[in-house]
Swiss-Prot record:
Record GO terms (molecular function): rRNA (pseudouridine-N3-)-methyltransferase activity
A Pfam family matched in the record: SPOUT_MTase
Protein name: Ribosomal RNA large subunit methyltransferase H
Free-text function comment from the UniProt entry: Specifically methylates the pseudouridine at position 1915 (m3Psi1915) in 23S rRNA.
The family this protein is said to belong to: Belongs to the RNA methyltransferase RlmH family.
Subunit and interaction comment: Homodimer.
Organism of this sequence: Xanthomonas euvesicatoria pv. vesicatoria (strain 85-10) (Xanthomonas campestris pv. vesicatoria)
A cellular-component GO term for this protein: cytoplasm
EC number in record: 2.1.1.177
The gene coding this protein: rlmH
Principal cellular location given in the protein's record: cytoplasm
Residues annotated for S-adenosyl-L-methionine binding in this entry: L73, G104, I123, G124, P125, L126, T127, L128
């Protein structure tokens, strides 16, 4: 099973890139994790935010692997504990499909992206910088994989 993190936004700060790379490397023992950065839509004075979100959505949909199980990161999505995420990962592995996790832009996901998702996952009600969400998702995927492998990383 391969995993693709499709994230709207480019040019992550070095601390995000370094942290993501660390969890990407650790996770590679169990599951390859690929980061695909989507160019954000144009925003600003006089620009239509909905149009920017729809443009991002088209780029996200184009980046989806064929037949992947798609999980959209979304505030109203299903909250999961680390243990529940590990259970979901075990279920996804059993399906034999690749995974795609989607992180939207400032206004969230386009409606078409949410329709294409197999499920949505909320990492909590806090408003977080999208770059930080990349790091949190990578760490939680590593934690879940480590739990499934009986690795001592997770201590709860």
């Amino acid at each position: 099973m391969k995993c693709r993190l499709i994230a709207t936004g480019e040019c992550a700060p070095s601390w995000v890139a370094q942290g993501f790379a660390e969890y990407q490397k650790r996770l590679s023992h169990w599951m390859p994790l690929e980061l695909v950065e989507i160019e954000p839509g144009l925003r600003g004075k006089g620009r239509d935010a909905q149009r920017a979100t729809d443009d991002e959505g088209r780029r996200v949909l184009a980046a989806l692997p064929k037949n992947a199980y798609v999980v959209a990161l979304d505030v109203p999505g299903r909250p999961l504990s680390s243990e529940q995420l590990a259970q979901r990962m075990e279920h996804w592995r059993g399906q034999g499909r690749d995974l795609a996790f989607l992180i939207g832009g400032p206004e969230g996901h386009a409606a078409e992206v949410l329709k294409s998702a197999s499920e949505s996952w909320s990492i909590g009600p806090l408003t977080l910088p999208h770059m930080l969400v990349r790091l949190i998702v990578a760490e939680q995927l590593y934690r879940a994989a480590a739990m499934l492998a009986n690795h001592p990383y997770h201590r709860a």
